[in-house]
Each structure stands twice: as C-alpha cells, then as structure tokens.
Amino acid sequence: MQRLKDWTVEDLNEEQKKVHDEIVNGPRGRVVGPLRIWLNNPKLARVAQQVGAYARYGTSLDNSLSELAIITTGRVWSSKFEWEHHAPLAIKAGIKEEYVNTIAQAKRPIFDNQIEQIVFDFAAESNILKNVKDDTFAIAIEKLGQTRVIDIVGICGYYSLISMTLNVFKVPNDTLDWPLPEINDFSNMLK
C-alpha cells in the first residue's frame, strides 16, 4: 500500500498545478510513479523532473545504452515499478531480451557488444560498490569519452533517486507483466 495519499489535479495548489502542467506538457506527457510523490513538494518535483527529462531524453548516450543503465540501476534497487516500465523499453531500444532476463536475475550478462558491456559494468559497479574500479573507469573513458561517462553517472544517480522514492513510498506497479525476483545479493552482477 502506498504510504502517501494519492491526489487528483483538483487537490493541487497553484504551485503544484504549475509543476504538474510543466510535466504533462513535457516529453513525459503524464505524471506517474515518483513524480506523483514529488509533486507533494513542488520545488523538488520541478528540479527532479528537469534532471529527469535530461537523463531520459537528452543525454549523449544512444537510447539503448541509456535504458541499459536505467534497468541496471532499477535492478540493484529492486525497484519493481522502474523495472516493469524500463525493461520493455530496453528491449525495444535494442538490448537483447536474454541480457535483460540475466540482469533481472541479478547476474552479469556477457554482451556481444563491447560498449554495452562497458555501460553495464560501469552502471553495476557504481550502484553496487558506490564507486567504479579503476580499470572500469579507464576503459569507459577510453571507449565512451568523458561526456558519456558523466551522463552514465547522471542517469544512475537520477534513477537511484527514482528507485529510492518508489521503494520508500511503496508506489504500486500499474502492471505485473514482468515480475522481478526478490534478490538481496548483487555480487554476481560484478565482473
């Protein structure tokens, strides 16, 4: 059960309505999940949704790599809502379903594509270790460049905020199409 009472547009004050309208008129087109929680604090909602619009739609990464970083973060946080929204998007963007299923099991896929492997390893380490190993950082900088590495950190950080919000406030999933197993040990995701 969600920990905060949900709201309707009629419940919102003027500042909340402004932020609500910014979100609805932006790339998302709707207010769902963590945004519904954040809108209780419209100042946070405004800033977070702006960062989120960049993290989701504006980074230097291809969509498939962004979605890979997102689902890796969501998996480590055991965020079922996040997983169910982004696992299908990762596949649609070009990440093989077998890799997505391996990540769902909290295991490290061995990608055919070196860049996907680098992004996965970087995202997994940053979320699990709260840092990345020197060799992971070096190869990421060499193959991706600093802008894309910074964007991976931004995506992982933003989706950690999302996942924490979803978990802490017990935001329910709107679907149960892709169950996420309960796993507490993520060491098998590390190289």
Language-model regions, residue ranges each:
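Hydrophobic alpha-helical segments
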Residues: M1-K191
